[in-house]
Curated annotation (Swiss-Prot):
It comes from Saccharomyces cerevisiae (strain ATCC 204508 / S288c). The modification Phosphoserine is found at residues 69, 250. It holds the Pfam family RabGAP-TBC. One of its GO terms (cellular component) is mitochondrion. Residues 1-17 have a biased composition (Basic and acidic residues). It is found in: Golgi apparatus, Golgi stack. The gene is GYP1. This is GTPase-activating protein GYP1. GO terms for biological process: vesicle-mediated transport. Present with 206 molecules/cell in log phase SD medium. One of its GO terms (molecular function) is GTPase activator activity.
Length: 637
């Protein structure tokens, strides 16, 4: 009990001393604030003298009161001084050791006093929860924790009061893997080492990265956007003008290439002409080149004029004989043509002129009369229009060629010129239909064979699309018949059709030339009947090979027959690959459609905005498929 009462008495005395110290601190701060600044040293000395004559307990209490009083006064004084410095001008400061503050009559900061007061208060309350033996130990060692706490808060206060005025420090950079260490700074901070800084040397790397993340000023990255060329500053009009200039230069180069082949030549190299025409023919050269590729105009330039006069005269004579009273008119054929002509290209003004309709009607009727095996079939009226429109540009100035579809030929052509135009169109149409006669004879077996070949080709190229058509019960004949009958003319605009025919006639010319070369090689010089005739039906030699079928040997009779079939199916064969490429182009969309949607889509495909570039891509894809499957007979089975 004695120990407990003694502890209680000590606690009450300390508590009373704390209370009295707070009151004394407030009173002294009031007296000091009212006193003059000149008496401050004497007051400090008097308090120091008095503290030495008092007992130890009272001395410690008085010392605490003095520190509290000095702290409050100096805190207010420093606050006013900092305000004046801020308002007047900025003055960089150096790091100052907090231990020297007592020498300059500066006491610790209020935060330190509050911390010490809290520690003292906590120190006197701790014996309630400890034994009597620990009370003595805590009392004897009460000054040591205060010193450690003072050092801790002094370091923090020192950091807060530091002002860095070294502007030559290198800027840290971010390197791969973390922050890079600055290279040997030219100046260092004038900060004195303390015990806390020495203890934190081991954690320097971690603290440097942590502190630098909040104070680093990263250098700006180079502005790559500003280094762009002047192309980005070009307007849309300038870009379009440059594109037009490039296209014009390309056209001029192509025209010069065709001039080198066609001009000032006695014999035109049809092989070179075919190769260069595959990629498109300039408009000013197209009428002559088409006549050469189709086989209507001879390659010997000296014979061309006489040949044209003879063929045009033959056409005039045929018209006179056909429409004379001596010849009875085929009323059903004439009536069918008369119905189909107004429905030919109704969206083009050229074919709505009466003069054009009369010319097309005469051409088609004369062809039907001269080819009774097939007669007139719907679809031939579409095939005649590319020739008619292309040959019509011969009678227009080069600057008006693009207006051919809106001008009435009767306004700039005489009757004789119109007849010559009809004659050239008639003979070229005849040359074209000779290659696809099977498409228009009874039963149209050529078209049925093409549709079958198309289905088998799509089965090899795109099996998923073929299976989808099978699941939806879509038959190729339901949409591909018109593709074969009109050569895709109703699926494209006339301008793109004419471009497509540049390639078609180039492909056709290759087989026709080969056939002609074969027949010319077989021609023997004329002999009299007295000379023995060389047997015609003999087994060919080992080195003999048909130009159109170089991979197999055959008799001359079979060679002629097969070459004729090859010549007639040449255009059909390439056209099948074009149709396959055209169908596969819409494969992704068709896979999502049912039967009705598929038929509707394929009967009216979205090709209204197609350009010559789109047609060239289609023809290139068709050529690739032909190169892969032309000699593979499995896909035709």
């Amino acid at each position: 009990m004695g120990v407990r009462s003694a502890a209680k008495e000590m606690h009450e005395r300390d508590h009373n001393s704390d209370s009295s110290s707070l009151v004394t601190s407030l009173m002294k701060s009031w007296r000091i604030s009212s006193a003059s600044s000149s008496k401050k040293p004497s007051l400090y000395k008097m308090n120091t003298t008095e503290s030495t004559s008092l007992p130890s307990g009272y001395a410690s209490s008085a010392d605490r009161d003095r520190r509290t009083s000095d702290g409050n006064f100096e805190a207010m004084a420093k606050q006013q001084a900092s305000t004046r410095r801020t308002s007047n001008s900025y003055s960089p400061l150096r790091y100052v050791n907090p231990t020297l503050s007592t020498a300059s009559n500066e006491s610790p900061r209020p935060a330190l006093l509050l911390r010490q007061h809290h520690q003292r208060h906590h120190h006197h309350q701790q014996p309630r929860h400890s034994s009597s033996g620990s009370v003595g130990n805590n009392c004897s060692n009460s000054t040591e924790p205060n010193k450690k706490g003072d050092r801790y808060f002094k370091d923090l206060d020192e950091d807060w009061s530091a002002v860095i005025d070294d502007y030559n420090m290198p800027i840290p950079i971010l390197t791969n893997g973390g922050f890079g260490t600055p290279v040997a700074p030219t100046r260092t901070l004038s900060r004195k080492s303390t015990s806390s800084s020495i203890n934190s040397i081991s954690n320097m790397g971690t603290s440097a990265v942590r502190n630098s993340s909040s104070s680093f000023t990263y250098p700006q990255l180079p502005q790559l956007q500003k280094e762009k060329t002047n192309d980005s500053k070009k307007t849309q009009l300038e870009i379009e003008n440059e594109r037009d200039v490039q296209e014009l230069n390309s056209i001029i180069q192509r025209i010069s290439k065709f001039d080198n082949i066609l001009k000032d030549k006695t014999i035109i190299n049809q092989q070179d002409l075919r190769q260069i025409s595959w990629n498109g023919i300039p408009k000013i050269h197209r009428p002559v080149v088409w006549k050469l590729l189709i086989g209507y105009l001879p390659v010997n330039t000296k014979r061309q004029e006489g040949f044209l006069q003879r063929k045009r005269k033959e056409y005039r004579d045929s018209l006179k004989h056909t429409f004379s009273d001596q010849h009875s008119r085929d009323i059903p054929t004439w009536h069918q043509i008369e119905i189909d002509i107004p429905r030919t290209n109704p969206h083009i003004p050229l074919y709505q002129f009466k003069s054009v309709q009369n010319s097309l009607q005469r051409i088609l009727y004369l062809w039907a009369i001269r080819h009774p095996a097939s007669g007139y079939v719907q679809g031939i009226n579409d095939l005649v229009t590319p020739f008619f429109e292309t040959f019509l540009t011969e009678y227009l100035p080069p600057s008006q060629i693009d207006d051919v579809e809106i001008k009435d030929p009767s306004t700039y052509m005489v009757d004789e010129q119109i007849t010559d135009l009809e004659a050239d169109t008639f003979w070229c149409l005849t040359k074209l239909l000779e290659q696809i006669t099977d498409n228009y004879i009874h039963g149209q077996p050529g078209i049925l064979r093409q549709v079958k070949n198309l289905s088998q080709l799509v089965k090899r190229i795109d099996a998923d699309l073929y299976n989808h058509f099978q699941n939806e019960h879509v038959e190729f004949i339901q949409f591909a018949f018109r593709w074969m009958n009109c050569l895709l003319m109703r699926e494209f605009q006339m301008g793109t059709v004419i471009r497509m025919w540049d390639t078609y006639l180039s492909e056709t010319s290759q087989e026709v030339t080969s056939s002609y070369s074969m027949s010319s090689n077989d021609i023997k010089p004329p002999v009299t009947p007295t000379e023995p005739r060389v047997a015609s039906f003999v087994t060919p030699t080992k080195d003999f090979q048909s130009p159109t079928t170089a991979l197999s040997n055959m008799t001359p009779n079979n060679a002629v027959e097969d070459s004729g079939k090859m010549r007639q199916s040449s255009l059909n064969e390439f056209h099948v690959f074009v149709c396959a490429a055209f169908l596969i182009k819409w494969s992704d969309q068709l896979m999502e459609m049912d039967f009705q949607e598929t038929i509707t889509f394929l009967q009216n495909p979205p090709t209204k905005d197609w350009t010559e570039t789109d047609i060239e891509m289609l023809l290139s894809e068709a050529f690739i498929w032909q190169s892969l499957y032309k000699d593979a007979t499995s896909h035709w089975l």
